[in-house]
Structure formats: C-alpha cells, structure tokens
C-alpha cells in the first residue's frame, strides 16, 4: 500500500521554528494526493517532476528538518539531503540544486542514465523546490496569457471564440478554466481519462467526452451562443488535430501544453492505447521516444496548417516546436512563443507570479489575505477581477493557497503587510510566500521565458544564477537552482525562492530584502537587454545599474 503524505495543519511546531517548519510542511504538501499527480512515485507534476529522489531521501529530509538548528542550513542535491552546515539565523534554512549537469552532458539521454544510477532527479520547477500548490499555481499565469491574447486580437474577451489545446496535467489543467474565465469555448484533448476526471473534480473543466463529434457539437454551439464552456476530449492530439484539419474545422486559437518537453515520461504517442504506451515505455524506451517524437511532428504540423488557415497559434512553453523541428517540421518555429507575444512587457516591469500558502491549513487565512491585497492595490482592476474569479471558481488543493501577479514594489509591500497580519494575530499561523521559477529574472530558457530577447541574450544563463545568489544573500528561507524545467533537460536553467512570514521583526527584514531584490533582478535583466519598459522602471524605482544610460 502506497504512503499517503499530508502536511500538518495548525500551530504545533514539528521543527525548531517556523523558518524550518515552512519547508517541512510545503515539501509534504507537494506530495499531498490532492496536489501531486503521482504521489506514490514522488512525482508532483510536469511529466516526471519530483519532490525527492526516493522515499529514503524523503524520510531523511524530513528527519533533517525536524532536527535542524535555527542557525544551520540543509543542502539538497537533486532530491537528496547531503549536508547540514552551521551558517547564521538570517541565512536560508535550505539550499537546493536539482538536475544540474555540465553543459556538454546536458541532454535527456545522459540525464536518464545518471538518474537510473540514482545520481540525480528531475525537479521540474516547483516540484523539487517544494512550493507547488496544485493547478492554481499556473492558473493566473494562464489567465494573464489568454487575457493578453484577447486584448491583442479580440477586443479583450474570448467570448464567441473557440480555443483548441491539449494536455490536462498539473499545469496544463489550468487552460480550460482560464479560457472560460474570459468567456471562451475551449476543447482540450487529453489521453488520460483520469486526468480529465481530476480537472472535473476540481472544477477546472466543465464536461468530459470520448466522442469527437459530441465534443465539437458542444464547443461550436457554445462559441455560436457566446457562452463559456470547456470540454475535455479523451484522445490524442496527434490524431484529433489532423482530423479537425481534414474536416475543415479551424479554431480561433490553437496552443498546446502536453508534456512534450519529456519524450519518454511525458508525451504519449498516438496509434496505441494508454496502457500499451506505458508498457512500451518500460519494455523499449528507444522505440517509445521515436514514436512520441513522430506524433509530436504530426501534432505540430496540424497546428501549422490551422495557423495557415487563420488560427492564432502560439507555443505554450513545452518545447514541442523543437521536438517537431528535429523530426523534420522545418516551419515549426513559425508558431510564436507565448512570452515574447504576450508576457514580456509584464516581465519587463518586474511583474510575475507571486504565491502564498496558509501554513495553518485554514482557508480563512487566505480569504483575509485576499482582502488585504485588494485593499493595497485598488487601482489594479485585472487583479481585482482575478481575485474575485479565483475565490468563486478555484478549489484549494492541499494547504490553502493563492496566486496573483504582482510587480516590483507591490511584492514587498504585500509581503510586509502579511507579516504584520501574522504578528497581530489576524492570521492563525505564518504564511509562506514564494513564486514559480517562471518569473521575470529567474530563468534562462531560449524556447520559453527568454525566447527572442531584444539583444540576443536568449541562452545567457548568468541571470538565474545571479538571482539565486542575490536571494540567498538577501535572507530567503530557502532558495533553489534547477535545470530543465518546462522545456526539458538541456534547454533551461532557473531559480526559485521562498520566504516565510512568521510575524517576527527578522522576517520583516527578510521579506523586504527578498521581495525587492527578486523582482528587481528581473527588471535589471530586461533593462540590460534594452527593453524600454524595464529601463524606465529601473530609473523610476531607483534600481542601481552601473551601466544603465
């Protein structure tokens, strides 16, 4: 019988203080059955993104945190605790490095070989950095992306528009809800019936069907009537998308969030059942990868044909274009990436995904912080709309949590306000504040966050390392550096940061420094690349950049 892990609730400490209790609880929360995609195998989301290397390592991490002193730092090497060193009370309590490889060795084949030897672990982004909050963790970013698309192409709404996509995993499962929040009609293709059911259970999806004709009838009727609706179709996009092209049914928007970044443990080939695919994955991995890449080529070819016939097509950061390109689809990069198309301006002003978790386990703590963020930033109408929709439509998974996009200055102001609420006893327990690695200054990913940079610096990976070093120096509660998140091994380097608001004056210092430095490094990165919004933000906010003219 598999183990069931859930984070403790309430105010009883299992560690020496809340700065240690915070990672203790959020690591467990990552493996909560409500949160993780495959908790029995320590897989949190994103194909094979894990929280710990194996169960022995997990147990040792928990034991280490329970015994960690207030002035010690625990080191995690790809999901395994390898050392505890005396540092100081304002240093991070945990430092994490996941899946890092010397560049010439940085490909899936070498990674899988080293993983099989028990030497490394794929941490995705927030899986191995212990700050995943379920599908809500990506929902506002997805909402922001589709809102920006709607603003650019459709007068600010998806009403009366048909959006086609694929994938209903831990991250991709946010797509249907984001589309219906913007009043659109969405068809999502997913090979795994259980994943579709999970999105139904959490109310991210409206309807499930096995029948393409039925799915199209529902979606096209909703489009015609201008009603929001999301339909999950059990099927393979490499079969469904070409069939839509053959029928001449072209969506208004087409994208994709399957786990194409991982051709072995993520994307599922067409022409076989899910059970047959899983069996082939184990018996003949090389053949599986070959078939998966062939299916990706068919999938992307159909998206390109839809684009030629008038659909707005964009890549949603899973590296499917590169996989298809390597299989001979030379026009794959005619599909534009979502960051340069819709998100870059937000990143340039230091805006990105800001999340917080109620360690008490009480939803009321989140509702009170919802009110606080609205009180602090009444001029931000998109934020107001988002919080209202989130409270209405999003079901908490594991420990109650919230995400919203906040910019430079806003993050520190809100973080300090949360710490004050904890100090005054307005909240039942401390709050953990973190973010996705998919943020303004914390990623080098040429096929996603840093695609088509103005100065050609797409592949420069100094920036996420500087971000991690700066957050460590600023006194974050824990800091992580990962390789391969989102787009796969060899294609990205990225960093994460978390700070615990425990109500102390020391936390005021941590929060102000971290939540200023972290987004500030993103403004710096984009200003250095020549983005006018970032240059203006740096000057207006007084961010010191010695070479900024």
From Swiss-Prot:
GO cellular component terms, semicolon-separated: cytoplasm
One record GO biological process: L-histidine catabolic process to glutamate and formate
Family: Belongs to the urocanase family.
Top-level EC class: lyase
Main subcellular localisation: cytoplasm
Function, in words: Catalyzes the conversion of urocanate to 4-imidazolone-5-propionate.
Keywords: Cytoplasm, Histidine metabolism, Lyase, NAD
Compartments (UniProt record): Cytoplasm
Active site positions, chain numbering: 404
EC number assigned by the record: 4.2.1.49
Catalytic activity: 4-imidazolone-5-propanoate = trans-urocanate + H2O
Any Pfam family matching the protein: Urocanase_N
Keyword NAD: yes
PANTHER family, A to Z: UROCANATE HYDRATASE
Top-rank taxon, per record: Bacteria
PROSITE patterns linked to this entry: UROCANASE (PS01233)
The protein's name in its UniProt record: Urocanate hydratase
Residues involved in NAD(+) binding: 46-47, 124, 190, 195, 236-237, 257-261, 267-268, 316, 486
Biological pathway: Amino-acid degradation; L-histidine degradation into L-glutamate; N-formimidoyl-L-glutamate from L-histidine: step 2/3
Necessary cofactors: NAD(+)
UniProt xrefs under InterPro entries: Urocanase (IPR055351), Urocanase-like (IPR023637), Urocanase_C (IPR035401), Urocanase_central_sf (IPR038364), Urocanase_CS (IPR023636), Urocanase_N (IPR035400), Urocanase_Rossmann-like (IPR035085), Urocanase_sf (IPR036190)
Database matches in NCBIfam families: hutU, PRK05414.1
Cofactor binding note of this UniProt entry: Binds 1 NAD(+) per subunit.
GO MF, one annotated term: urocanate hydratase activity
């Amino acid at each position: 019988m598999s183990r069931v892990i859930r984070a403790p609730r309430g105010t009883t400490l299992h560690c020496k203080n809340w700065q240690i209790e915070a990672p203790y609880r959020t690591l467990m929360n990552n493996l909560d059955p409500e949160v993780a995609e495959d908790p029995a195998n320590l897989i949190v989301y994103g194909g094979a993104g894990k929280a710990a290397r194996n169960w022995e390592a997990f147990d040792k991490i928990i034991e280490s945190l329970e015994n960690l002193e207030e002035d010690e730092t625990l080191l995690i090497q790809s999901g395994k605790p390898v050392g505890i060193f005396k540092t100081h009370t304002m240093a991070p309590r945990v430092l994490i490095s996941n899946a890092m490889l010397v560049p010439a060795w940085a490909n899936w084949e070498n990674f899988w070989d080293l993983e099989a030897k028990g030497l490394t672990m794929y941490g995705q982004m927030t899986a191995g950095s212990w700050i995943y909050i379920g599908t809500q963790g990506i929902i506002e970013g997805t909402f922001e992306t589709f809102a920006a698309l709607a603003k650019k192409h459709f007068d600010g709404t998806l009403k009366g528009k048909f959006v086609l996509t694929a994938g209903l995993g831990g991250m991709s499962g946010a797509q249907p809800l984001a589309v219906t929040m913007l009043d659109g009609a969405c068809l999502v293709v997913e090979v795994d019936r259980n994943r579709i059911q999970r999105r139904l259970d959490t109310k991210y999806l409206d309807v499930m069907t096995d029948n393409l004709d039925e799915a199209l009838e529902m979606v096209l009727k909703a489009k015609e009537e201008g009603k929001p609706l999301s339909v999950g179709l059990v099927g393979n996009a490499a079969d469904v998308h070409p069939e839509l092209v053959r029928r001449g049914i072209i969506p208004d928007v087409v994208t994709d969030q399957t786990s194409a970044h991982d051709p072995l443990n993520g994307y599922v080939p067409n022409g076989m059942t899910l059970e047959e695919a899983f069996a082939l994955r184990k018996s003949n991995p090389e053949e599986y990868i070959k078939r998966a890449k062939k299916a990706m080529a068919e999938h992307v070819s159909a998206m390109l044909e839809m684009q030629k016939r008038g659909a707005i097509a964009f890549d949603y950061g899973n590296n499917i274009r590169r996989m298809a390109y390597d299989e001979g689809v030379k026009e794959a990069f005619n599909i534009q990436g979502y960051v340069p198309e819709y998100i870059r301006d937000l990143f340039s002003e230091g805006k990105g995904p800001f999340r917080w978790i109620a360690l008490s386990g009480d939803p009321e703590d989140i509702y009170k912080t919802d009110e606080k963020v609205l009180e602090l930033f009444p001029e931000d109408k998109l934020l107001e709309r988002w919080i209202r929709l989130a409270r209405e439509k999003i079901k908490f998974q594991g420990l109650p949590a919230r995400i919203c996009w906040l910019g430079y200055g806003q993050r520190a102001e809100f973080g300090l306000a949360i710490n004050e609420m904890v100090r005054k006893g307005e909240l039942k327990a401390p709050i953990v504040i973190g973010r996705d690695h998919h943020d303004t200054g914390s990623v080098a990913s040429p096929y996603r966050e840093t695609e088509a940079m103005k100065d050609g610096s797409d592949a420069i990976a100094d920036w996420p390392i500087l971000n991690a070093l700066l957050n460590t120096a600023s006194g974050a509660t824990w800091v992580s550096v990962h390789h391969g998140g989102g787009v796969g091994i060899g294609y990205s380097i990225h960093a994460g940061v978390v700070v615990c608001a425990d109500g102390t004056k020391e936390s005021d210092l941590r929060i102000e420094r971290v939540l200023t430095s972290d987004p500030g490094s993103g403004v710096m990165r984009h200003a250095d690349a020549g983005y006018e919004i970032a240059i203006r933000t740096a000057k207006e906010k007084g961010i010191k950049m010695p070479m900024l003219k």
